[in-house]
Design a protein with these regions (language model features):
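Alpha-helical interface subdomain recognition
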Residues: 1-97
Length: 97
């Protein structure tokens, strides 16, 4: 779980740095959003699994973390839309000039 979160954080920081320098592409930002949201859902599901039945009750924040993480999958464009955008950008990069 730790590795997944740190990987997403490092990727987001790199894309943010590229934005600051003005060298960012749409595929990088879409990839960053997609990877971070999928990592968040995966980690929150693992947290619920680790807690067992307690993961579903409101005494632990794992349930809320999952709901919040899932919102990133569907909010501001779904990950399927992001995949299509990334594929389109990669295809355009391979076309001869």
């Amino acid at each position: 779980m730790y590795t997944s979160l740190q990987s997403a954080r490092a990727f987001c920081y790199r894309v943010a740095s590229d934005c600051d320098q003005g060298t960012v592409s749409r595929k990088d930002t879409a990839s960053c959003l997609m990877f971070a949201s999928e990592s968040a859902v995966k980690v929150s599901l693992e947290a619920i699994q680790t807690l067992g039945g307690n993961g579903y009750i409101n005494d632990y924040p794992a349930g809320r973390l999952l709901r919040d993480a899932k919102l990133y999958d569907i909010g501001a464009g779904t990950n399927e839309i992001r995949r299509m955008l990334i594929g389109r950008e990669l295809f355009e990069d391979t076309l001869p000039d």
